[in-house]
Amino acid sequence: HYAANGAAEGRNATTLISAGEGAQAAIVRGSCTTKFDPRASRATNIAVSASRINGVVIQPGEEFSFNKTILPRTAANGYVEAPIYVSGKHSTGTGGGICQVSSTMYSAMLNGGIPATERHPHSLPVPYLPEGRDATIAGNYYDLRFVNIYNTPLQISAVADLRTGTVSVTLIQQ
């Protein structure tokens, strides 16, 4: 739905990898949608980080790093100060909210049976997913990583909708 109708609904649509003649149709391997307050400062960071992973293609056997794909988290790259968790306490930091995108991706991975090669839980519960389905990102030391276990490319579709306050991540096997 998002890839086909996103532009008509005022969102950035993902262009799926076109299958060559004789190729099989794309298969959704995992998908997840979470909700957020689109008026909160973290909404900006959710939108920026979703746009950075949107359309990324992971080749067979290649490892994807969420951190490397969205870095650097600076004001110059569009990230803003927003609430974060630090060692079990509430704080603020540049990029607060990006973990909702990494957590939504991790939940999509779980839904699709794609194992993480690196994943760290938050130090406090998150309100947008059940316990055990979150994936925190911090500095250059906490990352969400996975290897494309399929024999064809895997594409990430990530859409943050600031009107409805939802972020969706879909993993599509080509």
Regions found by a protein language model. Name each.
Residues 14-174:
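Well-ordered beta-sheet/strand-loop patches within structured domains
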